[in-house]
Amino acid sequence: MPVLGSQRRLLGSLNCTPPATFPLTLAPNRTGPQCLEVSIPDGLFLSLGLVSLVENVLVVAAIAKNRNLHSPMYYFICCLAMSDLLVSVSNVLETAVMLLLEAGALAAQAAVVQQLDNVIDVLICGSMVSSLCFLGAIAVDRYISIFYALRYHSVVTLPRAWRIIAAIWVASILTSLLFITYYNHTVVLLCLVGFFIAMLALMAVLYVHMLARACQHARGIARLQKRQRPIHQGFGLKGAATLTILLGVFFLCWGPFFLHLSLIVLCPQHPTCGCIFKNFNLFLALIICNAIVDPLIYAFRSQELRKTLQEVLQCSW
């Protein structure tokens, strides 16, 4: 991806240097203090990508197999899995090609490698944008199902869901093409950062409001059963923990990457920002980790989907 600092690009493999011996090193900074640089081995990238690949393929297969899961909510989850799948595929493909180039097992001209690198960058950027969009779509879907339960099936219909899904994919493709073409323009980077902040704010507002409604509902039940304190406190703590995990994982996995983009605009030449740029590979690895965690948060918590997943695994054996 076209960003400043240390990055995983195929063209760099044509003039490769031996990898660092230790995963954690202090990179010297000529104009400032030493930088803490975390080196991510290619083998770790491959491992994370393959784990995410298997997980998200299973989610897509389970939803496709079970007709009971053919609803807007599960279609959004399926599309999120497909987005995470593209994140995994693009990174596995890039890492594999880099390793082949470094080993001399693959001979390619610089122009061919440049085209392949551009294609992979489009895949990575498009899958990131679509993943963020579908996370937001899932939050909106859950919000409507709670606050407009009686009207949910008339508001969130299959045709509308399909139109939203199509719009997200088209917008993701166009955004990735624009980003790859105009990546050196400040406005493009600011738009991506603003999009991330908007998605984070949307999810935070919706999920906090849903938690407040759930706690209010729990208090009502507690009053009827005259056991207000235990039920309310237990439910509130459980809901707060779930909310913290959901938003915390989202922020921790995506935040560093978009901080990287922000600093490219704000302080591209500052020594401290340069230290952060050196850890771009770590930020990319965190996004792949998010692709691993997403199925655990959004898909595998469904009993129906877990049951279907067991059937899929049994059939594969």
Swiss-Prot record:
Signal peptide, first to last residue: none
SUPFAM superfamilies: Family A G protein-coupled receptor-like
Subcellular location: Cell membrane
Chain coiled-coil ranges: none
Cytoplasmic side of membrane: 64-72, 141-163, 212-240, 301-317
Primary role: Receptor for MSH (alpha, beta and gamma) and ACTH. The activity of this receptor is mediated by G proteins which activate adenylate cyclase. Mediates melanogenesis, the production of eumelanin (black/brown) and phaeomelanin (red/yellow), via regulation of cAMP signaling in melanocytes.
Gene symbol of the encoding locus: MC1R
Sugar-bearing residue positions: N29
Topology in the lipid bilayer: Multi-pass membrane protein
Keyword Mitochondrion: no
Subunit and partners: Interacts with MGRN1, but does not undergo MGRN1-mediated ubiquitination; this interaction competes with GNAS-binding and thus inhibits agonist-induced cAMP production. Interacts with OPN3; the interaction results in a decrease in MC1R-mediated cAMP signaling and ultimately a decrease in melanin production in melanocytes.
Domain of life: Eukaryota
Keywords on record: Cell membrane, G-protein coupled receptor, Glycoprotein, Lipoprotein, Membrane, Palmitate, Receptor, Transducer, Transmembrane, Transmembrane helix
Ranges of the Extracellular topological domain: 1-37, 94-118, 184-191, 267-279
Chain residues carrying a lipid of type S-palmitoyl cysteine: C315
Family label: Belongs to the G-protein coupled receptor 1 family.
GO terms assigned for molecular function: melanocyte-stimulating hormone receptor activity
InterPro entries: GPCR_Rhodpsn, GPCR_Rhodpsn_7TM, Melcrt_ACTH_rcpt, MSH_rcpt
GO cellular component: plasma membrane
Primary location: membrane
Organism encoding this protein: Dama dama
Regions crossing the membrane: 38-63, 73-93, 119-140, 164-183, 192-211, 241-266, 280-300
Identification of the protein by name: Melanocyte-stimulating hormone receptor
